[in-house]
Design a protein with these regions (language model features):
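Long, contiguous binding/interaction regions
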Residues: 2-22, 32-64, 68-162
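Amphipathic, charged alpha-helical scaffolds that flank and support histidine-based chemistry
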Residues: 25-29
Length: 162
């Protein structure tokens, strides 16, 4: 990515629906030609079963963010609570010094909530997960790939046994 001057916006790694197979979600902004080349290079790596790229309209994505706010400001400024409710965020921890607010949703909502809370002067700390995404297609491409490999393996075993 560095060699091609592509900035990774987020990286998420999780287990997939297939035991022993993990899914890497890399979010980056670039043109189609560049991402096609990078995808082909990733596919060539050892232990990579498949690599695909998707545009925003081909995936469902969410993020989670945590906002640490000053509790005194939260108590003194009703606007802070209004902003939290406006974005359907929830307060998950409160003590006398700070409160923690959690927000799940689209990247834009998370950014907008951060900007509004920052403008109110109450943000002590902010972290976000990066995108977690799933394709909107009805099938899992890796499942098809593994099924195809299994079929070819069995066919080669049958031919060897003849």
């Amino acid at each position: 990515f560095t060699r091609r001057q592509i900035n990774i916006e987020s990286l998420n790694v999780s287990a997939s629906s297939i035991k022993g197979v993990h899914k890497y979600t890399i979010t980056a902004w670039t043109d189609k030609d560049t991402i096609e080349k990078v995808t082909k290079q990733i596919t060539k790596k050892i232990d990579v079963l498949q690599a695909h790229y998707f545009t925003d309209d081909e995936i469902y994505q969410h993020e989670i963010a945590l906002y640490k706010l000053t509790t005194p400001t939260l108590e003194e400024k009703p606007e802070v609570s209004k902003v939290i409710r406006k974005y359907n965020a929830r307060i998950v921890e409160v003590n006398s010094v700070f409160s923690i607010v959690e927000k799940n949703g689209m990247s834009e909502e998370i950014t907008n909530l951060y900007e509004e809370l920052s403008a109110l002067g109450c943000v002590l700390q902010f972290v976000r997960s990066g995108r977690v995404a799933i394709t909107t297609s009805c099938f899992e491409r890796v499942n098809e790939y593994l099924a195809d490999r299994e079929t070819k393996y069995r066919q080669s075993k049958e031919q060897q046994g003849q």
